[in-house]
Amino acid sequence: MSFRDLRECIDSERGMEDVGLAAGRSQREKKRSYKDLLREEEEIAEQVRKSSKKRSRELDLFLASESHKKKKKHLTDDYHADTPSPDLAKKKKKALLPSPAPPSSSDTAMDLLKAITSPQVDTSTTHLPKKPEKILATPVNFSSPSQSSHKEHHKKIGEVSGDDSSHRSKKSKPLTLREPDGLRMKLILSPNEKSEEESASPQGGPGHSEGASSKKTSKKTGREETESRSSHKKHKKESHTPRSGGTPDSASSTGGELEAGELIIDDSFHEMKKKKKSKKSKKKKDKHKDEKHRKHSKSKREHEGEERPTQIASPVLPSPPPPTATTPTSPPSVPPQALITHAEEQLDKKKKKEDPEKPKKKNMSAYQVFSKEYRGSIIAEHPGIDFGELSKKLAEVWKQLPEKDKLAWKQKAQYLQHKQNKAEATTVKRKSSSSESAARSKGSSSGLPSPNKKSPTSVVSFSTSPAKVPDTEPIDVAAHLQLLGESLSLIGHRLQETEGMVAVSGSLSVLLDSILCALGPLVCLTSHVPQLNACPKQILSNTLDNIAYVMPGL
């Protein structure tokens, strides 16, 4: 026992060690996977940093190259400005007409401000009247006032643009600004783009040359964006930018806007046409729906009108009280014959409506019978013959026939017509007998006497009062036997017309029904013989009522 215990302990320890090893492996694998994820995230972050650094370097290089070009141009302009001519002085005066005071040689800062606010900011040639060497020697002093004034100007423009954007949505009037064309184009830009342009422009660097280059790039981008917007925004009134009388760029932009306006008118016209078409189609659909709904409602009304008489004819009348001496004197509250006649009138109307829809069957002529039988032989002689040629040949053969043959064909046609008429009559009788049996069943359930078939000897003494039970008098018995005789004679005629054998099951059922219908009324006669009067009157009257269900028929 001790050896087994030791072995079990060793096995359990080994199992625990295996479990511990498995847990350690899973933890190591988890740590490795987590480390791999961290490494991948670090690599992605490094790639993003590298790409952003590359972009910033490319932008710096682009700005530096542009600023270098602008510096060269500025130096050449300054060199030419050292030797002023009378023509140049006149041009300067014309350019500086919007400024309030004439330029002076001493106030360089004022001249710079006027040059910035003048309409010739687009051109890079800002001609300074005198002392170019001092300005070149001290670039820091020159850049500080210009940059500060430029920033203030930007702030003012931002405020004005914010107000104008809020007013543009309410009114579609064009703005009239006093600033030159470049600043006007800046007003159209969104505040986000302005902030991007301001961040892109270098702050406190090489001075006026870099500021001018950033201004030019921002102007170009602003013009391109406004042109693209004016072409894209067709359905907005804000796309019509204000025009300041000046540069050819503004004229071209206004021309583009006019073209866009024309396109807008065309598009709106097409949209109006489409809307009109859609409205017309909707109206047509609504009309069709209304017509369908009307037809459906009419058919429903007709159906309800047809169902109402049947519902009127079948209300359950009060159960008949026990037979007393005072029952014949009680007047009926609702005459049932009136209800039945109303139902019959409705059925007649329905039949009259259905009759014109059904095609009337024409009488069979001798020529029709002859052509029906002789057509097959002609087709066998001439296969693939046309209908017109076939009818011509049939007419020729009919003309050549002697009178005896024609008479034979006429007799045959008459016989066929008679047969057809008989078949139709039997089908009509069947329908009428089924309707009468249904009416009888309703009468028996409500305590009414069953309506009998028309016959010369059937003189029924049933009263119209619903409370009276059917009588078992000899006249009633005779009426029932007459009905049985009529039905059996009709069955006999039909059997004579049929060619071939008759089913045994059908004949047996007819015989059984006829025996029951004959014995029922005969049993009622026992009530008049005192020695045989053992059956109560109620049972006899019920048997006479139920004969309608057992009446034989094929």
From Swiss-Prot:
GO terms for biological process: negative regulation of Wnt signaling pathway; Wnt signaling pathway. It comes from the Eukaryota. CDD domains: HMG-box_HMGXB4. Residues 360-428 bind DNA. InterPro entries: DUF4171 (IPR025228), HMG_box_dom (IPR009071), HMG_box_dom_sf (IPR036910), HMGXB4 (IPR042477), HMGXB4_HMG-box (IPR048016). Residues 272-300 have a biased composition (Basic residues). Keywords: Developmental protein, DNA-binding, Nucleus, Wnt signaling pathway. Coiled coil: none annotated. Residues 221-230, 342-358 have a biased composition (Basic and acidic residues). It is found in: Nucleus. Residues 434-466 have a biased composition (Low complexity). Transmembrane segments: none annotated. GO terms for molecular function: DNA binding; protein kinase binding. It holds the Pfam family HMG_box. This is HMG box-containing protein 4. It comes from Xenopus tropicalis (Western clawed frog).
